Design a protein with these regions (language model features):
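Peptidoglycan-targeting cell-wall enzymes and recognition modules
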Residues: 3-27, 55-166
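Acidic, Ser/Thr/Pro/Gly-enriched interdomain connector segments
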Residues: 9-19, 211-247
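Extracytoplasmic/secreted envelope proteins and their assembly/folding machinery
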Residues: 12, 29, 33, 47-50, ...
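Secretory-pathway/luminal and periplasmic proteins that interact with or process carbohydrate-rich
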Residues: 26, 56-66, 174, 191-199, ...
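Surface-exposed patches in mature extracellular/periplasmic domains of secreted proteins
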Residues: 40-50, 63-67, 174-186
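Acidic helix/loop microenvironments that form the catalytic cleft of cell-wall polysaccharide enzymes
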Residues: 54-57, 132, 177-196, 250-263
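Long, repeat-rich segments with strong aromatic
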Residues: 148-209
Length: 283
């Protein structure tokens, strides 16, 4: 998908670099091209801040639903207000995400009581973890959906981006992006400064990549296997002198196994960093 609505050159290779380790980076790029300009997240500074902040909150765009799988000990430490300090025994809630959600989110953010199941239905979703009936209702109005419909939408790529952009716009975070103020954006998103160092690191890297001072590497030294896609797969295919479409299919796997066997490696069809370094002649 073309990125014609951005005010800078925004490429798929950039997103693959920034979402390194996310095998769906190409799909995220397509969704970003469709959604971000609609919310005026269209400059290098704004996109860098968006990807840095959302990447921190979602484990690099890989987690679209809140993880509430806490142990009893974890509940007492993370949510003492609802367990230890409230005199509630955490043992019955050990590794029970639904029960946990219905305790910690009951009777707030327009959620009903524990038995309503609202805590679970309206738990965190999307790349900025939209939470609570109130927020899902408000976002739903923006996209012409009910709160219940919105809970499903935010767990898709387009919906995750749309909901994050809605939050971004509602809280005027572009002004922090324009000022390159990572600390200010973090406070507005997080309510504090949790993860500030990681957010700053991601932002600096994003600015380097998006501002035109970065050249895409032919090979990213991470593990690729059947089902992987991207420039590293294409580079391997070119090295093996087979059809180079960037998709690691059964044919590519078969050729990789032959190459591995020829070079004294376990012929498992998986190319890790060491195998890639050997293939491309790097130490």
């Amino acid at each position: 998908m073309a990125a014609k609505d951005f005010k800078f050159k925004f490429t798929e290779e950039m997103v693959i670099e920034l979402l390194r380790g996310n095998e769906e980076a190409e799909d995220w790029y397509d969704a970003m091209c469709e959604i971000l300009p609609l919310w005026e997240i269209d400059t290098a500074e704004r996109v860098a801040m968006f990807i840095a902040q959302c990447g921190h909150e979602s484990n690099n765009f890989k987690v679209l639903s809140e993880n509430l799988n806490y142990s009893a000990d974890g509940l007492n430490k993370v949510f003492p207000k609802y367990f230890k300090n409230a005199g509630r025994d955490a043992a019955p809630y050990h590794r029970q995400p639904r029960k946990i959600a219905n305790i910690i989110y009951a009777n707030r953010m327009d959620n009903g009581p524990t038995e309503s199941d609202d805590g679970w239905k309206f738990r965190g979703g999307g790349i900025l973890q939209l939470t609570g009936r109130y927020n899902y209702t408000q976002f739903g109005k923006e996209v012409d959906m009910t709160a219940e419909q919105a809970t499903e939408y935010v767990r898709t790529k387009k919906g995750a981006l749309d909901s994050a952009c809605w939050f971004w716009d509602t809280n005027d975070i572009n002004k922090f992006a324009d000022a390159r103020d990572v600390k200010g954006a973090t406070k507005r998103i997080n309510g504090g400064y949790i993860g500030l160092e990681d957010r700053q690191k991601h932002y600096q890297h994003a600015m380097e990549v998006l501002s035109g001072h970065w050249e895409p590497s032919k090979v990213v030294y991470e593990t690729i296997r059947l089902g992987s896609r991207g420039p590293t797969v294409k580079a391997v295919q070119e090295e093996l002198e087979i059809g180079a479409d960037g998709v690691f299919g059964p044919g590519t796997e078969a050729h990789v196994k032959k190459w591995q066997e020829k070079n004294g490696l376990t012929p498992d069809g998986v190319m890790g960093p060491k195998s890639l370094a050997m293939m491309f002649g790097e130490d």
